[in-house]
Each structure stands twice: as C-alpha cells, then as structure tokens.
Amino acid sequence: VGGLGCDVYLFSAYKTFGPHQGIMVLREAFGMELPGQAHFFNQGTLYKRHTPAGPDHAQIAACAGMADYVDAVAAAHGIGGDAASRNSAVHDLMRAQEVAVIAPLLDYLAGRNDVRLLGPRDAGKRAPTVAVELDRAAVPVSEELGRNGIACWAGDFYAVRPLAALGIDREKGVLRMSAAHYTSAEDVTRLIGALDRVL
C-alpha cells in the first residue's frame, strides 16, 4: 500500500470471497492527524485509535480463508510457485472464466431493444456485474426471475448519483445480474432463457 503513495486504502474483503469485513490501511502520520474514534487512552496506538469497538477477531481470522481459497484453486489447477505467482495465475483463471461466461449475456442484452445495457458491451472491459435499465420497474422483473430460479436483484445499488446522471429514475431502478468464476455457461444460458420468458 505504501507504494501507491496514498494516505488511506480501503478494501472490502467480501469482494475477494472473504468475510464482510472492511480493511483499512492508514499512513501512520495521516492516521494520527485524524480525530480518534476510540477511548482517550487508546489515542496513541494507530489501530486502536480508529477501531472504537476493538478488532473483530473472528472476522480477522476469517480473512485468512481468502488466501486458503486462492491456494485451493491453484492446487486444483496444478498451479505452483510462490504466493504472489499463484495469486496472479488464479486471478487470470478467474478473470478468463468471468469474461467467457458474461460475453453471451452482453451480446443477448445488446440485441434487445427493450433494455438499455449500462457500461461497456465488451466483457473484457468490465466487471462481470451487468446492469440494465428496463422499459418498466426493475423490482417486479427481478421477482419474476426469482420465481424462474434466477437470483438477481433490482434497485439503485447505492449508485444514486450515477443513475441520475444517466437519466435513470431511481424508483424504477435497474436490474443487476452478476457472474463469478464459478458461474457456468449453462447458468448464463438459463439466465438468458428466463430473461426471454420474463421480458
């Protein structure tokens, strides 16, 4: 993190298949400048100064599972080497799978005239999270997809300002579908079939 030259680095562990734990790295001098959030007697220790309830030991321990998971995926694919090279190779495997499975969905959505695909159409230039504006409210569509065995959601996803800038009514919301490295081509085929029925 020091190499980035930033004062604060925030990360959500669940974004890499870990627990719902926020991770924060503060440059020490900057962290000591910020107002403390804890007891007065903990103000001199950086990690205590900004952790008013103390560390959540269970969540911290669970974060080790992220590295264990990457190592398990590496082992399953015969990937060796040091931790950094295993992590890089597993990242590339996961990313290739995400791109492969999301591309047919993007092609399908781009071919419809009743949805507005948000973001790039090229699967290689986006995260495997796909949002579309519909010609109607998104929540009922999400609920109907759920009745068809598809787990997705609808709403604003805390992107209130970006949606407003795109001219999307917050009450109407968007439909969001996500893939991950464990999503199969068959999963996406089922999703497309359900979208055909529901839309």
Residues covered by each model-derived region:
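Pyridoxal 5′-phosphate
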Residues: 1-199
